[in-house]
């Protein structure tokens, strides 16, 4: 875990501005876990049950579990819209899943601007993908959404993000540019 510690004084009744620095590894991408690309989900557009691999093809992809009408998800989707062109230029599949049909029906992609055309929406059948994400990535609370992974079809995970994250789109692109 990359961390930075800075000591500073806070005087009574005063604001102390501090620059937040997100540390990042200067090294190459590292495999941080495993996730089965043969996991099945139900496509939202046609109701067909299919696998992540069949949807995205061989190679790297992004898979996420979203909580519709929840601020962390809304923020993440605006971050995704902000890097639409870069994600489309990358050319890989993005699978955005919802825990249930109600969640999908409550989701309106138009709320977030222009999202990448490489997105496939779907439903997580019986919560199997969410459970595997939580177990494989050792997430403390499987119900904290959204959860984003960048993985490949050899089942290697190189990025995970859960809950509220600042600059998710930029973080995804930093990893993608190193692949």
Sequence positions of predicted segments:
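Structural microenvironment flanking redox-active thiols in thiol-disulfide oxidoreductases
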Residues: 61, 72-116, 127-133
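Structured interaction patches on ligand/partner-binding surfaces of diverse proteins
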Residues: 2-23
């Amino acid at each position: 875990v990359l961390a930075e510690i800075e000591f500073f004084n806070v005087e009574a009744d005063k604001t102390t501005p501090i620059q937040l620095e997100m540390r990042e590894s200067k090294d190459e991408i590292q495999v941080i876990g495993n996730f089965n690309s043969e996991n099945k989900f139900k496509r939202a557009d046609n109701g067909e049950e299919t696998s992540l691999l069949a949807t995205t093809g061989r190679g790297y992809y992004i898979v996420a579990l979203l909580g519709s009408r929840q601020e962390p998800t809304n923020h993440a989707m605006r971050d995704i819209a902000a890097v639409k062109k870069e994600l489309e230029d990358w050319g890989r599949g993005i699978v955005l899943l919802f825990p249930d049909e109600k969640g999908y029906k409550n989701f309106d992609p138009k709320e977030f601007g222009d999202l990448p055309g490489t997105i496939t929406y779907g439903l997580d059948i019986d919560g199997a993908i969410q459970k595997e994400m939580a177990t494989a990535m050792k997430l403390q609370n499987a119900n904290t959404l959204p959860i984003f992974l960048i993985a490949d079809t050899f089942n290697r995970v190189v990025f995970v993000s859960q809950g509220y994250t600042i600059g998710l789109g930029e973080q995804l692109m930093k990893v993608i540019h190193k692949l």
